[in-house]
Amino acid sequence: MAVKIRLKRMGSKKKPFYRIVVADSRFPRDGRSIETIGTYNPLLDPVEVKIDEEATLKWMHNGAKPSDTVRNLLSREGIMEKFHNQKLGK
């Protein structure tokens, strides 16, 4: 089972709102997910990103791969740096 951390589109037409979810890569984008670990709202002026850092690191240590967009969001929040430091044992 290839697990990915990716965005699940919510909200109404022309007003997207995303949940950051852990899902099997075979499931559809807006389909079933294993766990919701955060939210992303691109419509607010300072973009709103809320991520459960502990759950994200747990899933990444278990082998979940973030999508490109989620990887950028995690980098902006400083989670990718913490993940790499933990992986290298710093």
From Swiss-Prot:
One of its GO terms (cellular component) is cytoplasm. It comes from the Bacteria. The keyword Lyase does not apply. It holds the Pfam family Ribosomal_S16. Keywords: Ribonucleoprotein, Ribosomal protein. It comes from Listeria innocua serovar 6a (strain ATCC BAA-680 / CLIP 11262). GO terms for molecular function: structural constituent of ribosome. One of its GO terms (biological process) is translation. Belongs to the bacterial ribosomal protein bS16 family. Transmembrane segments: none annotated. InterPro entries: Ribosomal_bS16, Ribosomal_bS16_dom_sf. The keyword Ribonucleoprotein applies. This is Small ribosomal subunit protein bS16.
